[in-house]
Amino acid sequence: MADSSFDIVSKVDRQEVDNALNQAAKELATRFDFRGTDTTIAWKGDEAIELTSSTEERVKAAVDVFKEKLIRRDISMKAFDAGEPQASGKTYKVNGTLKQGISSENAKKITKLIRDEGPKGVKTQIQGDEIRVSSKKRDDLQAVIAMLKQADLDVALQFVNYR
């Protein structure tokens, strides 16, 4: 019998983030408490999002609105890293970044966790920014997925290519 396997990745669907950004921009444009504050939210490059407003508390509230929209679109908060508000002339800015891929440090933590606490006979391989987990039994793979969902890791994980 062939080995069963799955891949652990950390990727964000850019289209879903774009939808959340557009929903947040629409809400910021129409909400009463944001009137006259020149609050904007926009892409800044491929992985960065910039929020600007006239006051520090309004830019923090704009970040909260954006995070709420991300949650509604099933995007983990671990995938979005919002910076601190920075004064820039008469406005305040917050630069946020999307975290994609599993760093080698986090990959080592995850493989060590699987080796130490996972079922016996489960093998892991680090392949760039993803991890391949294989085993003879599919039940062991499902146990690994359940264990990783319960673990408190600082990376948003998705499980793909389950075969």
From Swiss-Prot:
Task of the protein: Nucleotide-binding protein.
Presence of the UniProt keyword Chaperone in the record: no
Xref: Pfam families: DUF520 (PF04461)
Source species, domain of life: Bacteria
NCBIfam families in alphabetical order: PRK05412.1
Entry's family note: Belongs to the YajQ family.
GO molecular function, one term: nucleotide binding
Cross-referenced InterPro entries: DUF520, UPF0234-like_C, UPF0234_N, YajQ-like_sf
The keyword Nucleotide-binding appears for this protein: yes
Organism: Mycobacterium avium (strain 104)
Keyword line: Nucleotide-binding
Cited PANTHER family: UPF0234 PROTEIN YAJQ (PTHR30476:SF0)
GO cellular component: cytosol
Protein name: Nucleotide-binding protein MAV_4575
